[in-house]
Design a protein with these regions (language model features):
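Positively charged n-region of N-terminal signal peptides that target proteins for export
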Residues: 1-4
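Short, Gly/Pro- and small/polar-rich lid/capping loops
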Residues: 15
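N-terminal small/polar-rich segments of proteins
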Residues: 22-89, 106-148
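Short, surface-exposed beta-strand/strand-loop-strand elements in extracellular ectodomains
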Residues: 88-101
Length: 148
């Protein structure tokens, strides 16, 4: 009986010391972040030769070929030219021209997403060709690209 009493006492003590352990709820938050610098690639027309007597010659296109821009920002391209081809042997002899997008003179454009482009044409009036002196003529066209 002593064994039985010892066993009962041990069982009672074990039951008395049993307790369910509860862990306190603990939530933590972490931040995941990255930064992407704005990047873009703009393609501009290459050197172009205008055939004698050609009123309209393709000048290629300005194209935003790749872009990761900030929201609300754009890539702006401005074109600057004298509008006059000068004779290499006598710079006082000139041939007027315009660079056009469609039927309008082109000066600038803004691009917001990759793939946007503006086709350009070099336009020389027939009358200007008729008045031009023989020789080689050149001018430089400057493209300014900015991010705003």
């Amino acid at each position: 009986m002593k064994k039985y009493l010892s066993f009962a006492l041990a069982a009672a003590l074990s039951a008395a010391f049993c307790a369910t352990a509860f862990a306190a709820k603990d939530n933590r938050q972490v931040e995941v972040k990255t930064h992407i610098d704005p990047t873009y690639t703009v393609t501009i027309p290459a050197n172009t030769t205008v055939g004698f007597g050609d009123v309209d010659t393709s000048f290629g296109a300005i194209k935003l070929t790749a872009a990761q821009l900030d929201p609300g920002k754009s890539v702006n391209v401005t074109l600057k030219s004298s509008g006059t081809l000068k004779n290499k042997n006598d710079t006082s002899k000139m041939l007027a021209y315009t660079i056009r997008s469609g039927e309008s003179a082109f000066t600038s454009a803004s691009y917001k997403k990759a793939g946007e482009s503006t086709a350009l044409t070099i336009h020389i009036e027939k009358d200007d060709w008729a008045k031009a002196y023989a020789g080689d003529y050149t001018d430089t066209v400057e493209f300014t690209i900015s991010y705003k």
